């Protein structure tokens, strides 16, 4: 998934960086509250320092595991929404679906089955079919 996002960013000459975990995202300037998303896309390079990103990434993807389920669906969802993340995908292998939050649109989340192609709301033309990645 990271490679698809990275290729799309590079192909479209976006001034963004794609970071896989472990990469710290801090939600306050004292750098005490942080998470490590599975994939982060940061387009504002002023948010980057030697420890990670201070402030909200533009786009975050989390892949749910049994141990991270509650954190990904509730805690991180609230943190990302409050911090200003523009788009958040929760990829859930157990349920074979992806929950997509387009926070800028202030709408209910969209649910996409792994067999469906997901279109990014903030990156026109970025499409990912999770089932294709799992083959």
Q: Where in the sequence are the language-model features?
A:
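Gly/Pro/Ser/Thr-rich low-complexity, intrinsically disordered segments predominantly at protein N-termini
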Residues: 1-135
């Amino acid at each position: 998934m990271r490679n698809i996002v990275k290729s799309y960013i590079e192909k479209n000459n976006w001034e963004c960086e794609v970071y896989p975990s472990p990469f710290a995202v801090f939600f306050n300037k004292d750098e005490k509250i942080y998470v490590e998303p599975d994939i982060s896309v940061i387009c504002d390079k002023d948010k980057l320092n030697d420890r990670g990103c201070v402030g909200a990434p533009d786009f975050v993807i989390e892949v749910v595991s049994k141990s991270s389920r509650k954190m990904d669906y509730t805690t991180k969802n609230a943190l990302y929404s409050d911090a200003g993340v523009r788009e958040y995908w929760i990829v859930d292998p157990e349920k074979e679906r992806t929950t997509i939050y387009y926070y800028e649109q202030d709408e209910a989340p969209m649910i996409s089955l792994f067999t469906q192609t997901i279109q990014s709301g903030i990156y026109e033309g970025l499409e990912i079919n999770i089932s294709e990645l799992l083959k």
